[in-house]
């Protein structure tokens, strides 16, 4: 899952 850089 890739949604870490967009949230932080």
From Swiss-Prot:
Cofactor(s) the protein needs: Ca(2+); heme b
Annotated compartments: Secreted; Secreted, Cell wall
Signal peptide annotation: none
UniProt cofactor note: Binds 2 calcium ions per subunit. Binds 1 heme b (iron(II)-protoporphyrin IX) group per subunit.
Key words of the record: Calcium, Cell wall, Heme, Hydrogen peroxide, Iron, Metal-binding, Oxidoreductase, Peroxidase, Secreted
GO biological process, one term: hydrogen peroxide catabolic process
Annotated GO CC locations: extracellular region
Keyword Iron: yes
Coiled coil: none
EC number: 1.11.1.7
Top EC category: oxidoreductase
Reactions the enzyme catalyzes: 2 a phenolic donor + H2O2 = 2 a phenolic radical donor + 2 H2O
Main location: secreted
A GO molecular function held by the record: metal ion binding
Family: Belongs to the peroxidase family. Classical plant (class III) peroxidase subfamily.
Function description: Removal of H(2)O(2), oxidation of toxic reductants, biosynthesis and degradation of lignin, suberization, auxin catabolism, response to environmental stresses such as wounding, pathogen attack and oxidative stress. These functions might be dependent on each isozyme/isoform in each plant tissue.
Protein's UniProt name: Peroxidase 4
Organism: Cycas revoluta (Sago palm)
């Amino acid at each position: 899952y890739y949604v870490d850089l967009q949230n932080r």
